[in-house]
Amino acid sequence: MPAISLDHLRHHAVARTLFPPTTLPQAIARLGFVQADPIRAPARAQDLTLRHRVRDYRAGDLEHHYPALAIEEDFLVNYGFLSPDVQALMHPRQPRTVWSAERWRQAESVLEFVRARGEVHPRDVAEAFDHGRVTTGFGSASRASTALLDGMHYRGLLRVARREAGTRLYAARPATPPPADPEAAFDALVDLVVAKYAPLPGVTLGQLLSHLVHGVPQWRHLRAATLQRARARLPSAEVDGLRWFWPEGEEPSSHDHQPREAVALLAPFDPVVWDRTRFERFWG
């Protein structure tokens, strides 16, 4: 393999991540994970990401087509959209915050209610159960039932069936058996994340593993060993004083990765520019 330069890495990053527009399912599959954000101005993160990668994409298309797509909403390194197979690797999730027996009784009652209805709006749960109100992390008051639904979704008891004007509607989620090999499952999740953000500096690889632990808190004790394995098994090269990593089978120095003769306005959540360390190395 020829010596790899920063120009090689930059061209490779743009070519592999900002690929020619395709269909919505194919774009999601190629990205592996699409980060979501509720802020609508100038548009949601998922729409700003997909508009460059899906033919004739319009704001809201992902939300509109979500029920018919083989995707789920869940937390990986951040919240977003991913395949059911990837979601299954992370469950049953064991959050660091342990619920009390009373909280579990509330969850079981709500789960029974959801199963009977098939699909529920948070408003339906609030009207059926008197859970009171809680203070959010932003200091505002919110229905306790909304926080409970969020917690049930995070724990894998519920799934997002669809959205209505941006609000998540929930359905019961079948229980997922734990992976037979947690280390292999963790490695597979690392590979997915690396495939989205590669080529990436070693410091970013470590940061992504820390974010990934929020998606699989039950494996937080495996983080150090998983990072060590990733550094050992992923292709890498030292460039301008940093160790860079990318997926197996890729060649950043390939002549296929020529500069694009086009201008793209990218949002901060876009995988091309998401990592500040890489962005500063590539573009100053």
Model-identified regions with their sequence ranges:
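Long, low-complexity intrinsically disordered regions
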Residues: M1-V263, D270
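Short, basic/aromatic recognition patches
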Residues: V273-G284
